[in-house]
C-alpha cells in the first residue's frame, strides 16, 4: 500500500497538529482558535507553494480566507476543527493563557455564522482552548506524516516552531503589517498596529 498523498485542506490541518514544534515532540498542541486560524492563513500565503510543490492540492482547494473584523478569516477552519473533534480525532482542553478580547470576539462571530443553536451553553462562553490530536488522530495522521519528504517535515516543523509560542498579539501584528488587504474590515486594526494602523 502506497502512502496517502496530501490532497486536501484537512490533511494540512491534521499535519499542523501532528508535527513537532519548538519542543520537538509529535502532537505539540496549538493554543487558541485565532492562532490556529492565522497559522493556516500564513501557511497558505508563505509556505504552501514550497511545501506542496508536487502535490495535487492547490490554493483554490485550500481554506479560502476573506478580510473580516479581526483579520483573515475562514469559517471552514472552525468547521473542520469541529468535524474532527466530533469524530474523536482532535481534542481540546482549556489553555492556561488568558483569552484576548480579539480571540473571543472572533469566536462569537463564528458562532453567529455557524449552525449552532441559540443558547447552546456548551458553545456560548469563550475560553482559550488548546488543540491536539487524540490517540486515534495520531494513529490516523502518522502514515501521512511519514509519507512527507524530509524537506516537507523540516518546513512544517520550522513553521510550527516559529508560530506556536509567539504571543498572539505579535502574530496578529505580523499578519496585519504584511497582509494589509486582509485587514480592510478589521475592527481592531488600530489596537493591533497602534498609531501606525491608521493611514
Please tell me what each predicted stretch does.
Residues 1-199:
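Domain-edge interaction signal
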Amino acid at each position: 500500500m502506497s502512502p496517502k498523498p496530501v490532497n486536501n485542506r484537512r490533511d494540512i490541518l491534521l499535519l499542523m497538529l501532528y508535527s513537532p514544534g519548538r519542543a520537538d515532540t509529535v502532537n505539540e498542541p496549538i493554543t487558541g482558535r485565532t492562532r490556529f486560524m492565522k497559522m493556516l492563513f500564513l501557511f497558505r500565503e508563505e509556505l504552501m507553494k514550497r511545501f506542496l510543490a508536487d502535490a495535487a492540492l492547490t490554493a483554490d482547494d485550500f481554506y479560502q480566507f476573506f478580510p473580516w473584523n479581526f483579520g483573515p478569516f475562514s469559517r471552514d477552519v472552525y468547521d473542520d476543527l469541529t468535524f474532527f473533534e466530533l469524530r474523536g480525532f482532535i481534542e481540546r482542553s482549556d489553555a492556561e493563557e488568558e483569552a484576548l478580547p480579539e480571540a473571543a470576539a472572533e469566536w462569537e462571530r463564528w458562532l453567529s455564522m455557524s449552525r449552532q443553536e441559540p443558547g447552546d451553553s456548551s458553545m456560548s462562553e469563550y475560553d482559550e482552548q488548546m488543540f491536539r490530536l487524540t490517540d486515534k488522530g495520531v494513529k490516523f495522521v502518522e502514515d501521512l506524516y511519514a509519507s512527507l519528504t524530509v524537506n516537507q517535515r523540516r518546513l512544517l516543523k520550522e513553521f510550527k516552531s516559529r508560530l506556536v509560542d509567539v504571543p498572539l498579539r505579535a502574530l496578529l501584528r505580523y499578519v496585519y503589517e504584511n497582509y494589509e488587504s486582509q485587514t480592510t474590515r478589521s475592527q481592531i486594526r488600530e489596537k493591533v498596529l497602534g498609531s501606525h494602523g491608521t493611514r
